[in-house]
Amino acid sequence: MGFRINTNIGALNAHANSVVNSNELDKSLSRLSSGLRINSAADDASGMAIADSLRSQAATLGQAINNGNDAIGILQTADKAMDEQLKILDTIKTKATQAAQDGQSLKTRTMLQADINRLMEELDNIANTTSFNGKQLLSGNFTNQEFQIGASSNQTIKATIGATQSSKIGVTRFETGAQSFTSGVVGLTIKNYNGIEDFKFDNVVISTSVGTGLGALAEEINKSADKTGVRATYDVKTTGVYAIKEGTTSQDFAINGVVIGQINYKDGDNNGQLVSAINAVKDTTGVQASKDENGKLVLTSADGRGIKITGDIGVGSGILANQKENYGRLSLVKNDGRDINISGTNLSAIGMGTTDMISQSSVSLRESKGQISATNADAMGFNSYKGGGKFVFTQNVSSISAFMSAQGSGFSRGSGFSVGSGKNLSVGLSQGIQIISSAASMSNTYVVSAGSGFSSGSGNSQFAALKTTAANTTDETAGVTTLKGAMAVMDIAETAITNLDQIRADIGSVQNQLQVTINNITVTQVNVKAAESTIRDVDFASESANFSKYNILAQSGSYAMSQANAVQQNVLKLLQ
């Protein structure tokens, strides 16, 4: 080998290796001090890109978890508020049930209604004030609200909370047929009861026999109420149009085929003869007699069979000729507020034929707070003599003395009706006058033209005008202040409870969905962080070994450079 002084190859190699080793030692120290395998892009370019992507995903998933927890907090707030509303509705239904018995007076029912009104106000107060971060939750505006629960955009869960104000819940469908005056076999089908299928009930006979009539039909309908969602009630009641006057029944007077015979009764049935005679056979006829607060005769079917009067009950009873055969009114109730579509055969026998006026209305909880409108009351079946939302007033005059107290009050001399004669005006008229109007009050004069049978000198009468006045037709009183109203409020409160339960069930489902999602993305976040750590974080055991290696190499490199420099001294020996 040659000896050179100008270029120390050994020293250069030792220096070069020392520089490389020093760089590796610096990297090792950097990794050990930071805990990261990748401290710069130069350490691992592709690894850094993957690690950064994983870090971003993990951070986003962390915020998604927070979003989900916020959503759960919102839904829990609404759920607890609705729990209080349900307690209020339970109390409302309890008070309506308390009012739904005739042991209550108008005064006590009015107090119960006042309590119900205050409860409704509190229910609405909860609905209008429950909020989260300034956002109303129960007002109906919290609809299709989205919560980001993924690392990528549009990975959301939607939540909707329905309105819970009294005007939005409890919407109950009431449908009541017209008064039925015909018997027969009825086949009833509810169309699309579940949105798809029809439900056909067994045929029911409408008659005056035991086990027939609207009572039997209502029983048949109610057996399947859980499936169809439709419940039925009935009202088979015949009420006189005026207070009982003195009169006599005929020898062949009978109710539902059971002969009662001749009865002499007094004004107001003060001797109790008429009511007692009818009630003496009530177990056979199924019809019970009573007097209402105005002294009118009331015949009520105990089991929903029809009421048929044959023979002559007497004009003093207040029962008109067209009332002698009565099969009542059928009322249907559906708690979801949707129309009740029916079809079948002989539906006119239950007042629901194509030509009958069927009263229909959907009523919310709030509408039971104030006065119930005439239309709603009719749909609920409040009055046996209403139909199609119209007020039907039928009046035959029982005694002239009740309508004329002196000459010149509407009847002229020679008319055939003297003051106090007791003659029945219906004898002079072939039919009663029927007024159908939705007006608040009625007072009209009906002028009789020539040829009508009431012209002067006709022998029927010598008056040229007939004056009629009917009582005001007002809305029914509020809520539970009547027995029928209390029953209706029970139905409405039950619907409202069902509505809130449905909303709460939806909220619960979304909460569960959110919780499952949070659990899933929490696991995903852990795995993503683990993957990032594998790429980015340093393995201290491995790196410590590397550090020891590079540290020893650094020391040996220094020794090598020292020895390489000493080699040049050997040239001097050649010059000695």
From Swiss-Prot:
Its keywords, alphabetically, are:
Bacterial flagellum, Secreted
Q: Out of the domains of life, which is the source?
A: Bacteria
According to UniProt, the name of this protein is: Flagellin B
- Could you say which residues form the signal peptide? none
**Locations listed in the record:** Secreted; Bacterial flagellum
Assembly and interaction partners = Heteromer of FlaA and FlaB. Interacts with FliW. Interacts with FliS.
Q: Which InterPro entries match?
A: Flagellin (IPR001492), Flagellin_C (IPR046358), Flagellin_C_sub2 (IPR042187), Flagellin_hook_IN_motif (IPR010810), Flagellin_N (IPR001029)
**One GO location term (cellular component):** extracellular region
Q: What does this protein do?
A: Flagellin is the subunit protein which polymerizes to form the filaments of bacterial flagella.
Give the organism's phylogenetic lineage.
Bacteria, Pseudomonadati, Campylobacterota, Epsilonproteobacteria, Campylobacterales
Family statement drawn from the similarity comment of this UniProt entry: Belongs to the bacterial flagellin family.
Q: Name one Pfam family in it.
A: Flagellin_N
Q: Name one GO molecular function term.
A: structural molecule activity
